[in-house]
Amino acid sequence: MIRKAFVMQVNPDAHEEYQRRHNPIWLELEAVLKSHGAHNYAIYLDKARNLLFATVEIESEERWNAVASTDVCQRWWKYMTDVMPANPDNSPVSSELQEVFYLP
């Protein structure tokens, strides 16, 4: 299993809305994430800094990257553009983090 972590931002006035939209996420999106090998996906909110910290375990980089080209992911990204900064393709602005410590 490959562990990934990344940081995104949420608009200061959208903390509650961001959380509402994720509880629960669309069943179709959940199915796509699982079918593409995502496990133990979690997102944490740092309210003071409007930061989102996400962790996910994936089976392969190729399958994980393929999620972005699915119709449901494209619709989800568009749905989220009013609550968080987005790139021109509507994907969330994010930075992948480097793992520096792991205790199994």
Curated annotation (Swiss-Prot):
Top-level lineage group: Bacteria
Gene: rhaM
Compartment(s) of residence: Cytoplasm
Family indicated by similarity: Belongs to the rhamnose mutarotase family.
Role according to the record: Involved in the anomeric conversion of L-rhamnose.
Chief site of localization: cytoplasm
NCBIfam families: YiiL_rotase
Catalytic class of the enzyme: isomerase
Keyword Isomerase included in the entry's annotation: yes
EC annotation from Swiss-Prot or TrEMBL: 5.1.3.32
One Gene Ontology term, aspect cellular component: cytoplasm
Pfam families the UniProt entry points to: rhaM
Signal peptide: none
Catalytic residues of the enzyme: H22 (proton donor)
Catalytic activity: alpha-L-rhamnose = beta-L-rhamnose
Naturally occurring in which organism (per UniProt): Escherichia coli O7:K1 (strain IAI39 / ExPEC)
Pathway listed: Carbohydrate metabolism; L-rhamnose metabolism
GO biological process, alphabetically ordered: rhamnose catabolic process
Full protein name: L-rhamnose mutarotase
Complex and partners: Homodimer.
Keywords: Carbohydrate metabolism, Cytoplasm, Isomerase, Rhamnose metabolism
